From Swiss-Prot:
It comes from the Viruses. This is Uncharacterized protein VP10.
Length: 236
């Protein structure tokens, strides 16, 4: 087995119920063909994480296997990927656990409502199995952008990158897009939905939404992302 090992504890109960709680939607509102694209759900600490298998840019064609991405819901913790138990990826896969701290020293680059856009420095990433700070080559926010909606409101969008290297080989990169300041106005959602889905298509990875984002928007982007790109959308 060439894959990295991390562990996780299975969520008790039904995936439909998990998603119902997560999205605030009745399970019957979510098409079963979308649900089938979830490979598994696990409980990581007090946070529910979703596994999704997808092709990842950055691995060679000979290693072009599916990658399991664990997206933690807590975007403010100071630790990346603390898990326990037994979980193994497929050969050639890498598991990336993403949860990035927001510090208070760069408010000029922060999205609206966020005090800063600074993440924890390289070398302070903590993994209890498989991954260590020595093979995390980059952990950074790679861009902060401002989106103006059709009502003239500004919304901060920032992309989060984690690149993991193992055995002197660049295996995978996961880009996470966090959107803050969303409103329930349908015109706003159309503008930002288009932007978010464009980013999903460009990165081929996952999207995280800041807390307070309207659940209908998260739900609609989740469905559209899966149907269009086979990607995971989760609420931070």
């Amino acid at each position: 087995m060439n894959g990295l090992s991390l562990s996780a504890t299975k969520v008790e109960g039904n995936l439909y119920a998990t998603l119902d709680s997560f999205l605030g939607k009745a399970p019957r509102d979510m098409p079963t063909h979308v649900l089938r694209k979830f490979e598994d759900t696990v409980e990581v600490g007090s946070t529910t994480a979703f596994f999704v298998h997808q092709t990842t840019n950055g691995i060679t064609s000979s290693d072009n296997a599916h990658t399991a991405i664990i997206m933690l819901a807590d975007g403010t913790t100071s630790t990346l990927g603390e898990v326990s138990g037994n979980f193994s990826t497929d050969a050639g896969d890498v598991v990336i656990a993403s949860a990035i701290a927001v510090a208070s020293n760069s408010p000029q680059n922060a999205p609206p409502g966020v005090a800063s856009a600074t993440i924890i420095p390289e070398g302070s990433v903590n993994f209890n199995s498989g991954l260590t700070s020595s093979n995390v080559t980059q952990a950074r926010i790679n861009s902060v952008q401002q989106v103006t909606d059709s009502l003239g409101k500004n919304h901060g969008v920032f992309c989060r990158d984690i690149h993991v290297q193992r055995d002197d080989r660049h295996l995978a990169a996961t880009k996470v897009i966090a959107v803050s300041g969303l409103t329930t106005d349908s015109r706003t959602q159309v503008v930002l939905s288009s932007y978010v889905l464009q980013r999903i298509s460009a990165t081929g990875t996952s999207v995280a939404f800041e807390s307070g984002v309207h659940k209908d928007f998260v739900y609609n982007v989740l469905l559209t992302a899966y149907e269009s790109h086979g990607c995971l959308a989760t609420k931070a």
